[in-house]
Amino acid sequence: MKILGIESSCDETAAAVVADGVNILSNRVSSQIDIHSRYGGVVPEVASRQHLLSILPVISDALKEARTGFDEISAIAVTNGPGLAGSLIVGVNAAKAIAAARGIPLVAVNHLHGHIYANWLSGRIPEFPCLCLTVSGGHTDLVLMKGHGQYQLLGRTRDDAAGEAFDKAARILGLSYPGGPAIDRASQDGEAVLDLPRSWIPGSHDFSFSGLKTALLRLVENGEVCSVNDAAASFQKAVVDVLVTKTLNCAHEYNVKQILLAGGVAANNLLRKQLSEQSPLPVSIPPIGLCTDNAAVIASCGYFRFISGGQDRLDMDVLPALSVVS
């Protein structure tokens, strides 16, 4: 069964064809990073206009790469939230138009669930129950999965998401956008020598990174940062220490079989290394190309929802504020 996935929640226009939820036949992404980097962040209006220009060519390219026509597509899976409203609308309207014109079933996919399903495209099928650490620019969640479509939120950020914290730290240190990769690169040439705080929030699986960001800002303002690379390494280590420690504690408490890593921040080298080395449980870590926004993960998630009877009407709407558990 072939699923066409469409993703346009932020600043990537993406389309993919995935067979049976696990085999990627194509995965095309048109990135807007170069456009938004001059502004130091994503400009919603600019993102929407670029999606309009890119969406149909990207879908066409995905079908060509997969050597597939619409007559072989069993369903169209499209991200309907969370994300930027104007960006989401472009992908959803394209999916609706194709579904209506071709008589193909439509499946709405939660972008956060899509990130998790990168682990079904990584060569080994995860075991339930599993704990997923989803870390991105807008979300930092610990989610228990007992089966397909079964999500229980165990922990979340109370302020800044991990990816947002990296972006802000990069701006404080004068590094480039996007901040996560910039911090990661700078850290390769630095040492984690700065004493930065870690917010543990005893008795909770929640996260908090705003205090860490403020502490870094104060050090910079007071002239106590001599090396940008050391500061980046210190900030990254503080974030990763909290992410890994709280994930392992949560996994032990809920007696899961496996830990899954997902989201854009899952591309961080230290996080991937530290979680793998410190976990007593098997850890599934997707290839870096599947951590950032793409449509293959949307198609995979959509497949499992579709075979379980999930299908949406053509009046389905975008949900910009959708959470991992709705």
Curated annotation (Swiss-Prot):
Residues bound to substrate: T134, V135, S136, G137, G138, D167, G180, D184, N268
Keywords: Acyltransferase, Cytoplasm, Iron, Metal-binding, Transferase, tRNA processing
Catalytic activity entry: L-threonylcarbamoyladenylate + adenosine(37) in tRNA = N(6)-L-threonylcarbamoyladenosine(37) in tRNA + AMP + H(+)
Positions with a binding annotation for Fe cation: H111, H115, D293
Keyword Membrane among UniProt keywords: no
Gene3D superfamilies named among the record's database cross-references: 3.30.420.40
CDD domains linked to this entry: ASKHA_NBD_TsaD_bac (cd24133)
GO biological process: tRNA threonylcarbamoyladenosine modification
Enzyme Commission number, as recorded: 2.3.1.234
Subcellular location(s) per record: Cytoplasm
Keyword check for Nucleus: no
SUPFAM superfamilies given in the database record: Actin-like ATPase domain (SSF53067)
Family annotation (HAMAP family): TsaD
Protein name per its UniProtKB record: tRNA N6-adenosine threonylcarbamoyltransferase
Upper lineage: Bacteria, Bacillati, Chloroflexota, Dehalococcoidia, Dehalococcoidales
Gene it is expressed from: tsaD
